[in-house]
Amino acid sequence: MSQANAATKASSDVFFNASLEDIDPEIFGAIRNELGRQRHEIELIASENIVSRAVLEAQGSILTNKYAEGYPGKRYYGGCQYVDVVEELAIERAKKLFGAEFVNVQPNSGSQMNQAVFLALLQPGDTFMGLDLNSGGHLTHGSPVNMSGKWFNVVSYGVRKDDHLLDMDEVARPARENKPKLILAGGTAYSRIWDWKRFREIADEVGAYLMVDMAHIAGLVAGGQHPSPVPHAHVCTTTTHKSLRGPRGGMILTNDADIAKKINSAVFPGLQGGPLMHVIAGKAVAFAEALKPEFKLYAKNVVDNARALAEELKSHGLDIVSGGTDNHLMLVDLRPKNATGKRAEAALGRANITCNKNGIPFDPEKPFVTSGVRLGTPAGTTRGFGVAEFKEIGSLIAEVLDGLKVANSDEGNAAVEQAVKEKVIALTGRFPMYGYQG
């Protein structure tokens, strides 16, 4: 073997066999530190969850090497016979999970799935209705800073000021006045049951499409803990992470063949090129997990835990927007503790409790300050936390907020936060992740 060939072989051996730690210790270190953070902190961000080792393995597989523009059986590249199997499994499992006739599993994110529906069903300048961001909607539901708010005429609906619940008569009124081409239901911070049937009645009355973004509650729908929008909506979108407990990505479902064709064309070639086949593999694995009987128990536990956490927080003098929760999340009004969301998020973070500041309906504070935090139970429930643990977590949150109230500063109360942090580490140590003890 020549010296050049030997060098090439040696380089190839390193390329295919060296570990991440050997090749890039900086990235390896960041990942290791993030794993430590996830192990030792309580994750209460409602849009986050913990995937299984099987999902991690699928998403980290050699499928990342394969380009597969198009759809199964109709690709623009050769060598797609095995990734076709992967995508077809993901589609069939999603159909079974949600009772939908047509599914597109290619959207790379929640924003892109919603953009695909807009591209398929609307023209620039068309009118659509969506839940106002301040009432628990999403940026892609018509926020003026988002493409959805820039390209279309948006009419927002919101919650009532007295009880923070949706008033369906106040959804119907602007729909009749504005005759939107599409009505979008669903949100990111609404803790009550959605009346899909009434939304469809309103949509039919004004001749609009009904689109449901069930990204936050898809796992609860799959697990039988929230009514399904699929029989009512013309088209549904959902992320595949959050309560569904899969990899980060999006999905679109419909029972209408004509809409399905438009959706497929909007996703590819309208918005995306080659799909992320390693992510689609992770989606397929997560759907298989969600089809198992134990996922129904998981979904029930998510809701039970959320209700327990909300009641515990109320017992410590905090207000819960709309008075409680019927799903996996809650908005906590911090004003009884004289705290802002910004301060509370930072103080809880120092105590190893992760959440996000969040505006509450009719919030007097600025968006980067807020009067509330949003809390969710999917990740903690995946870890194995039950009602007892979430009651303890509620008490720990109140302890931090009471300390923050006494300190009345951005720095918080170091002694209280350290004491809570030690309790959190003890709690998380009883529920190891990925086979790790301690």
From Swiss-Prot:
<feature type="modified residue" description="N6-(pyridoxal phosphate)lysine">
    <location>
        <position position="242"/>
    </location>
</feature>
<dbReference type="InterPro" id="IPR015421">
    <property type="entry name" value="PyrdxlP-dep_Trfase_major"/>
</dbReference>
<feature type="binding site">
    <location>
        <begin position="137"/>
        <end position="139"/>
    </location>
    <ligand>
        <name>(6S)-5,6,7,8-tetrahydrofolate</name>
    </ligand>
</feature>
<feature type="site" description="Plays an important role in substrate specificity">
    <location>
        <position position="241"/>
    </location>
</feature>
<keyword id="KW-0554">One-carbon metabolism</keyword>
<dbReference type="InterPro" id="IPR015422">
    <property type="entry name" value="PyrdxlP-dep_Trfase_small"/>
</dbReference>
<dbReference type="GO" id="GO:0019264">
    <property type="term" value="P:glycine biosynthetic process from serine"/>
</dbReference>
<keyword id="KW-0028">Amino-acid biosynthesis</keyword>
<keyword id="KW-0663">Pyridoxal phosphate</keyword>
<dbReference type="InterPro" id="IPR015424">
    <property type="entry name" value="PyrdxlP-dep_Trfase"/>
</dbReference>
<dbReference type="GO" id="GO:0035999">
    <property type="term" value="P:tetrahydrofolate interconversion"/>
</dbReference>
<protein>
    <recommendedName>
        <fullName>Serine hydroxymethyltransferase</fullName>
        <ecNumber>2.1.2.1</ecNumber>
    </recommendedName>
</protein>
<feature type="binding site">
    <location>
        <position position="133"/>
    </location>
    <ligand>
        <name>(6S)-5,6,7,8-tetrahydrofolate</name>
    </ligand>
</feature>
<comment type="similarity">
    <text>Belongs to the SHMT family.</text>
</comment>
<comment type="function">
    <text>Catalyzes the reversible interconversion of serine and glycine with tetrahydrofolate (THF) serving as the one-carbon carrier. This reaction serves as the major source of one-carbon groups required for the biosynthesis of purines, thymidylate, methionine, and other important biomolecules. Also exhibits THF-independent aldolase activity toward beta-hydroxyamino acids, producing glycine and aldehydes, via a retro-aldol mechanism.</text>
</comment>
<dbReference type="GO" id="GO:0004372">
    <property type="term" value="F:glycine hydroxymethyltransferase activity"/>
</dbReference>
<keyword id="KW-0808">Transferase</keyword>
<comment type="pathway">
    <text>Amino-acid biosynthesis; glycine biosynthesis; glycine from L-serine: step 1/1.</text>
</comment>
<dbReference type="Pfam" id="PF00464">
    <property type="entry name" value="SHMT"/>
</dbReference>
<keyword id="KW-0963">Cytoplasm</keyword>
<comment type="pathway">
    <text>One-carbon metabolism; tetrahydrofolate interconversion.</text>
</comment>
<dbReference type="GO" id="GO:0030170">
    <property type="term" value="F:pyridoxal phosphate binding"/>
</dbReference>
<dbReference type="GO" id="GO:0005829">
    <property type="term" value="C:cytosol"/>
</dbReference>
<dbReference type="InterPro" id="IPR049943">
    <property type="entry name" value="Ser_HO-MeTrfase-like"/>
</dbReference>
<comment type="subunit">
    <text>Homodimer.</text>
</comment>
<dbReference type="InterPro" id="IPR001085">
    <property type="entry name" value="Ser_HO-MeTrfase"/>
</dbReference>
<dbReference type="InterPro" id="IPR019798">
    <property type="entry name" value="Ser_HO-MeTrfase_PLP_BS"/>
</dbReference>
<dbReference type="InterPro" id="IPR039429">
    <property type="entry name" value="SHMT-like_dom"/>
</dbReference>
